[in-house]
Amino acid sequence: GVIMGTPFNLQNRKMLFSNYANHIKGVGNFITGADVGLTIEDLVVMRKTNSSIVGLKGDPVRFTALGMYCSIQLCLGEIFGSEDISNRTFAIQGLGNIGIAILHLIYGRAKRIVVADIDDGQVQIAKSLFPNIEIISSTEIHKVKVDVFSPCAMGGILHDLSIQRLR
């Protein structure tokens, strides 16, 4: 589910997530994890209201990246006839938790990796961890010819114009 709204003070936030957890009781188990705007503390509040809430333990980043990696492999198999990434080129837009986790999974195995982020600090962190990556502007990365384009930024990356420019 998605909850959209303005930032809440702590008391209103607890009430919001408690009410949300109560509302979803009828759907059965609800599997979630901390994500953008959703904290472990929010999940604890939800769990107190609804015992079917799961996802409080473990690092969701690792599992998100692994799920993306498996999806990429399946797509490669479908399109190229092999899930092997060793001869494949990648573009990763966004070097936050997920982008870095994807790099950990493909670095040293992929033929070429091009990355971009609007935060120069994140770019430098990625370059120090993965010295052979190529850095490109966030406004240009979707124009680079690659086998796999992985948008790991906050959103709005793929739209009518950017999709037309994918290579």
Residue ranges of model-derived segments:
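Glycine/serine-rich phosphate-binding loop and adjoining beta1-alpha1 elements at the start
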Residues: 2-83
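Short amphipathic alpha-helical segments and helix-helix/interface helices
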Residues: 17-21, 103, 123, 161-164
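Alpha-helix boundary recognition
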Residues: 25, 47, 107, 142, ...
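General beta-strand structural signal in soluble alpha/beta enzymes
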Residues: 30-35, 54-56, 115-117, 137, ...
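Flexible loop/turn segments at secondary-structure boundaries
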Residues: 39-40, 99, 122-123, 156-159
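ADP-ribose/adenylate-binding Rossmann-like module
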Residues: 148-158, 164-167
